[in-house]
């Protein structure tokens, strides 16, 4: 069985106590799969998918008030792009080598007519990706709160995929991605507290006696 080896970006493990970021690299193997109609449940370009996450974090980093916040957003955005590549590999491997009868029987026809077995950024209903999925307010606290919500939505999406998937190889990848979303949620919570403290410190006023 052919294997695909992906380097899952630069993963930022943020230590709240020492306020340092240790950048590590993680490798993950993706196996070639047989055709599976699970494609309709995968979100290569959905509202809570990896593409939106990477663009959101790359765009938000510029207005972060601390270098640590900028670095964390950049690192997680980079990792999300690696996750997007992994999801794209799954979509392609689930659909390549299909024949006309499989396309007709599986409900894959609408997608196939437009994209064949190409990997197109759309949600599970075939709706194309749009920048309207991402939020960039320019307010660091609002954006980081949005990021925490986005990670929970991504985790919930992977939970839903695991409920309907009967492919153990696919499930291994989805579980890995789900775990990373949980870690991202925790890191964003930590950096939100740090940024809030930095902003509050600048707004303190002292009155002389």
Language-model features, listed with the residues they occupy:
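Non-heme di-metal
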Residues: 1-9, 18-209
């Amino acid at each position: 069985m052919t294997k695909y080896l992906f380097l899952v970006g630069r993963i930022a493990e943020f230590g709240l106590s020492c306020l340092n970021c240790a950048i590590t690299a993680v490798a993950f193997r993706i196996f070639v799969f047989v055709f599976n109609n699970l494609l309709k449940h995968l979100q290569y370009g959905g509202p809570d998918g990896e593409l939106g996450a990477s663009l959101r974090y790359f765009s938000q980093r510029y207005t972060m008030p601390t270098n640590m916040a900028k670095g964390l957003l950049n690192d997680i955005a980079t990792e999300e792009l690696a996750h997007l590549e992994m999801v794209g590999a799954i979509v392609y491997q689930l659909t390549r080598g299909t024949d006309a009868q499989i396309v007709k029987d599986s409900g894959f026809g609408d997608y196939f007519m437009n994209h064949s077995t190409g990997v197109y950024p759309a949600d599970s209903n075939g709706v194309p990706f749009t920048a309207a999925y991402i939020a960039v307010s320019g307010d660091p606290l609002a954006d980081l709160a949005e990021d925490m919500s986005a990670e929970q939505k991504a985790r919930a999406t992977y939970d839903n995929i695991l409920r309907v998937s009967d492919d153990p190889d696919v499930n291994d990848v989805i579980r890995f991605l789900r775990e990373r979303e949980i870690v991202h949620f925790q890191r964003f919570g930590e950096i939100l507290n740090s940024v809030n403290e930095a902003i509050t410190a600048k707004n303190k006023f002292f009155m002389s006696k």
